[in-house]
Amino acid sequence: MIALLIGAGLALLCALVGTPLFIRLLVRRGYGQFIRDDGPTSHHTKRGTPTMGGTVVVAAVLLSYGLTHLIMFLMNPDSPGPSASALILLFLMVGMGLVGFLDDFIKISRQRSLGLNAKAKLILQAAVGVIFAVLALNFPDESGLAPASTKISLVRDLPWLDLAFGGTVLGAILFVVWSNLIVTAATNGVNLTDGLDGLAAGASVMVFGAYTLMGIWQSNQACGSPREAGSGCYSVRDPLDLALLAAIMSAALVGFLWWNTSPAKIFMGDTGSLAIGGAIAGFAILSRTELLLGIIGGLFVLITLSVIIQVGYFKATGGKRVFKMAPLQHHFELKGWAEVTVVVRFWILGGLFVAVGLGIFYAEWVVLL
């Protein structure tokens, strides 16, 4: 618990101090956001706002995680160091962040709304996702438990939904596909949500907060631990270190949100949204709560569905629309809601999804107790 407090405190401080310094750097270089003309007219005033703020979040997370383990080692040389699960998750976050950084840089340098084309972006995301999936199935601990498994999970692995039903090789291939679906869905969900000042950052704070609580609980109730509760114990690799990383992510985003809230001094850009989405997907996979992510990240799912419905209905009806504009947050803007009103109400909605997800997580343990 001390490590979580140290890590969160460091991440908050790094993001709070680092973000304004990064803003000054971007302003000097003229790296500002390009705003589409077909978006809400109220957004035109945001043209030129510094972007790529996700760089600060990623840097704060990496620095805080490393420093926390260094401090814990200095306090107690026998304390466990960085875990395989956390390092693999950090790889996914950084890899996706680099894809987003490249996308942002192209937009800024060419002053257009399109960065990487869809095909190139998907290929790069898939490449990072494949490497993550392969790494996650390897590096077993002394008991043979790897960071991830081929079983699809809800609150824990579901033994009757094992992708390795046709053998180890087929299971590994299917896991790579399944893992990439989760990563792609999460990254695109956060990316679509990042359309209003503070919306994606605030919603993500709550999601990472949920994974912090779940990681602590999984550690307390780990199979083989003194506090194990029979059939309700969890077989998760490095749950407490994952909880530390989730707490660091949440705190770093709070620090960034201080500058990203309306009126935003900086945007996270695709650098941030893809890194955050990748991290969220990584937590779901490594904490064995893959299907539960659909509820905990329900706000991202809802916003993504609004785009799918809008595009599908538009094509099916020859130009008609369900919403005034998609993603969903812009629909309410065009209905006359103030941007801050939309953001706060969507935060409330996101918080409710997180609460329901946590309720399901703990209720399942009570049932198995």
UniProtKB/Swiss-Prot annotation:
The keyword Electron transport does not apply. It is found in: Cell membrane. One of its GO terms (biological process) is peptidoglycan biosynthetic process. CDD domains: GT_MraY. Its EC number is 2.7.8.13. InterPro entries: Glycosyl_transferase_4 (IPR000715), PNAcMuramoyl-5peptid_Trfase (IPR003524), PNAcMuramoyl-5peptid_Trfase_CS (IPR018480). It comes from the Bacteria. One of its GO terms (molecular function) is metal ion binding. The keyword Nucleus does not apply. Belongs to the glycosyltransferase 4 family. MraY subfamily. Catalyzes the initial step of the lipid cycle reactions in the biosynthesis of the cell wall peptidoglycan: transfers peptidoglycan precursor phospho-MurNAc-pentapeptide from UDP-MurNAc-pentapeptide onto the lipid carrier undecaprenyl phosphate, yielding undecaprenyl-pyrophosphoryl-MurNAc-pentapeptide, known as lipid I. This is Phospho-N-acetylmuramoyl-pentapeptide-transferase. The gene is mraY.
